Amino acid sequence: NNKLTFNATNGQTTAAGIAAFHTSVTVKDGTFTSNEVSDSDGSINGVYGTAVGVTGADGSSALTITNSTFTSNKGTSYNQTEGGAVYQSIGTATIKGSTFDQNVAETAKEPTKNNASAMGGAVSLWGTTTVIEDSTFTNNSTASHAEKGSSLGGALYLRSGVWGGAENLSASIKNSTFDGNSVKGTSAQGGALYAKSDYDSEKDKHYILNLDLDNVTFKNNTSDSWGGAMFVQGEGSLKMKDVTF
């Protein structure tokens, strides 16, 4: 019966609510509302998660979110923004019975780099084995204001771990709904969901992300460019059962 509430906190670079490095985080019955994270002009990297940010290196980090709500959280960067509410890299991510509404990942109006990008309006996951069940993603958005920037995954951004993590990863989404999410910009991909399997040309190695959707509904999602509902690329597989567009 533990309850956790973050309301209108502010921070820089990583997660105004919870920031964790090389460890595991469990959130149960949490409420994260109107948290904001931004960086400064000329910053090196970008913004990674506004409510929760978990960074791993050896695959041991685990993020578990259950029966929680993330509303109106916002990340803004002059370089790149990943995860308007939640970010994790390398490890495992489990999200069950949770709601993500009106979260935003965007670049600054006048970004430092002309290729500044925004990924995952609600959630951004790099190099993670992922399970999402019984969850709702509504009215989340990503937007890149850079001339050559990308806007990827209005609600959810999934990517394999070319910079670490296992070579073969799975992402399972079950009994969930994506409604009214959007990506905006000159290169906008995946109004609700973006998933990519990477290739390391120097090592000639593929990093595979296999995506499995079961009883998932996509409706009213939009993209300025490609994939109004979802955009999937790379060597990984895509399996769909009882998916509604």
Predicted regions and their residues:
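The feature encodes a structural signal of leucine-rich repeats
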Residues: G83, G190, G227-G228
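Surface-exposed loop/turn motifs in large extracellular/passenger domains
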Residues: N1-D41, G46-Y78, V86-E110, N115-A146, ...
